[in-house]
Regions:
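Right-handed parallel beta-helix
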Residues: 1-14, 29-46, 50-64, 70-92, ...
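Extracellular low-complexity, O-glycosylation-prone Ser/Thr/Pro/Gly-rich "stalks"
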Residues: 166-169
Length: 169
């Protein structure tokens, strides 16, 4: 999924940023959802292939999978997420308290291969993350796997991390 007309936001961060609009899958105001046996990746227009404008790489992708707006009882299983930066967002924003008591999500048996961050990034949710594989190498712009934000809970167990040839920092 790519946004042909991303927006430049000069007040996003210290020096501005590009923001894209479209996710590969958006789960919004939904309950009892099962996302199973899919492959999500940026193959045709990978981030590192984009030109630089205003000192930042042109960003034509948003999330691969976002679960927002009071969605609840969502299972994400046996999927592959590959070659992407901002992978998965669970929760709308820090200023969306209506997400409280919702966003109960389970992630299991997924492969996160060459993703940069947000696997997942959680706000207000209660997320069980187990038996997933996280793989990165020196070509991955890896920042973090899990992000626990406002009033979130992440229960993680039996996940495997392979940093390949990334030197320890």
């Amino acid at each position: 999924t790519e946004d042909c007309f991303p927006e430049w936001s000069p007040t996003d961060g210290v020096t501005g940023n590009w923001n894209s609009q479209y996710d590969s899958i958006s789960v919004s105001n939904a309950t009892h959802v099962w996302i199973d046996h899919n492959r999500f990746a940026d193959l045709r227009t990978r981030d590192e292939m984009q030109p630089t404008y205003f000192g930042h790489r042109y960003q034509v992708h948003d999330g691969l999978l976002d679960i927002t707006n009071e969605s609840d009882l969502v299972t994400v299983s046996w999927n592959q997420f590959a070659s992407h930066d901002k992978t998965m967002l669970i929760g709308s924003s820090d200023s969306a308290p209506e997400d409280r008591e919702h966003l109960r999500v389970t992630l299991h048996h997924n492969l996160f291969d060459g993703v940069g961050q947000r696997a997942p990034r959680v706000r207000y949710g209660k997320v069980h993350v187990y038996n997933n594989v996280y793989r990165a190498d020196k070509n991955t712009n890896y920042r973090s796997s899990w992000g626990a934000g406002t009033e979130s809970q992440i229960y993680a167990e039996n996940n495997f991390f392979n940093a390949g040839d990334i030197p320890p920092s």
